């Protein structure tokens, strides 16, 4: 209790802050005991999933001299996330219909056929098959 009397002698701007910190100290003690005491951050920033770097790499392969704005990148990132979620959801449904607990390339291929229209699904399936073959041969 001695620190409270010392805190009351601090300037007025600091005096009101000291009791609040003292009242929060016991609650934080349990959390900070495992954290390093060398002044490191208490919490790391939450990581945000993004396809931006991959979109940029593909753009540079296709059009090396073309750039992309942040707004366009955000739109493409949202588009890729949406398509990924649709395909994953459909593949999950197909796996559950067939009483399987694992999503294989067959479920992904079927879900792409169901979600993407016409010629687009044919190109997506051929590119996907090519990617799976390349991955399998590298193992």
From Swiss-Prot:
Region annotation (Disordered) maps to 1-48
PTM details? Monoubiquitinated by the UBC2-BRE1 complex to form H2BK123ub1. H2BK123ub1 gives a specific tag for epigenetic transcriptional activation and is also prerequisite for H3K4me and H3K79me formation. H2BK123ub1 also modulates the formation of double-strand breaks during meiosis and is a prerequisite for DNA-damage checkpoint activation. Phosphorylated to form H2BS10ph during progression through meiotic prophase. May be correlated with chromosome condensation.
**Which InterPro entries does the entry link to?**
Histone-fold (IPR009072), Histone_H2A/H2B/H3 (IPR007125), Histone_H2B (IPR000558), HISTONE_H2B_site (IPR055333)
Alphabetically sorted, this entry's keywords are: Acetylation, Chromosome, DNA-binding, Isopeptide bond, Nucleosome core, Nucleus, Phosphoprotein, Ubl conjugation
Q: Which positions bear Phosphoserine?
A: 13
Covalent crosslink: Glycyl lysine isopeptide (Lys-Gly) (interchain with G-Cter in SUMO)? 9
Q: Which residues carry this modification: N6-acetyllysine?
A: 9, 17
Q: Which GO terms describe its molecular function?
A: DNA binding; protein heterodimerization activity; structural constituent of chromatin
Cross-link Glycyl lysine isopeptide (Lys-Gly) (interchain with G-Cter in ubiquitin) position reads: 134
Protein location: Nucleus; Chromosome
Highest taxon of the source? Eukaryota
Which family is it part of? Belongs to the histone H2B family.
Could you tell me what this protein is called? Histone H2B
